[in-house]
Amino acid sequence: MAWLSRLALLSLLAGVCALPTNAKPLTFAVVPQQSAKKMAETWQPLIDYVSNYTGFKIDFKTAKDIPTFEANLADGKYNIAYMNPYHFVVFNESAGYRALARQRDKEIRGLLVVHKDSPIRSLDDLSGTEVAFPALAAFAATIITSAHLRMKSIAFVPRYVNSHDSVYLAVQRGFFNAGGGIVRTLNSSPDDVKQELRVLWKSKGYTPHAIATHPNMALADRQAILNALLALSNDTSKSWILKGIGFNGFIASNDSDWDDVRALGIASLSRPHL
């Protein structure tokens, strides 16, 4: 009978050892550039792929607006987060988030759009106008575009409308003369909005958004997630997942890959000196 007891104990221990590394679901947060519903539809297939590949349960998260997303990053509420280059530089320093991956063959560029019938033809024409932006700390859509206007000594009144979608809609409806955005979100905006807009200006390229992990995530778990992203990048049968988020693949990344953004002198969310 003793051997039966030992066998039962060994079976129990084997079962415990077979439990997933992450019994509690991981959170995969995406910076709120569009409506939560649209983002969930776009990103859930990627999250499902990573979850199935790693065996980790992963829940999609976003926030009602960019300031809330920033507050959650500051508090370390997300295990994995897709964040803009500015956020990564700030929260790598302040909260310890670590770079894991980024989009392959990609640089991020800010752009300014106007209504297609607008008389505005040059940046100088924006002098004295109201310009819509998603949020104060939106890297390409706000920081890069507004920095360029200031560099050219063009005075303008910034208005923050919480999302990229809201920027495009506000310009399309004539609420503001121009708005800041990025190519990907402009291309994915509704046709009836996009077709009414014209790109006035586009910036040079910077290292794109980061997929970063919480500083407390185990190295083995980071590697498993990275392996999933790299596997997806080479799985032609799943290319539709990447196409859904506008990516052509992922590459492994290090914190230093965002040194071009650090060179801009951005120190904090409250004082972007650009």
Model segments located where?
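Bacterial N-terminal signal peptides
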Residues: 7-16
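An extracytoplasmic/periplasmic, membrane-proximal ligand-sensing/linker region
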Residues: 26-30, 34-45, 212-213, 217-274
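Short helices/loops that flank or line small-molecule/ion binding pockets
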Residues: 67-81, 94-95, 124, 165-180, ...
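Hydrophobic/proline-rich hinge and linker segments of small-molecule sensing/allosteric domains
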Residues: 99-122, 210-214
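Extracytoplasmic small-molecule ligand-binding "clamshell" domains
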Residues: 23-87
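Pocket-lining segment of extracytoplasmic ligand-binding domains
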Residues: 118, 129-220
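N-terminal signal peptide c-region/cleavage motif recognized by signal peptidases
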Residues: 18-20
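Short loop->beta-strand "edge-of-pocket" segments that line small-molecule binding or catalytic clefts
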Residues: 26-33, 39, 124-141
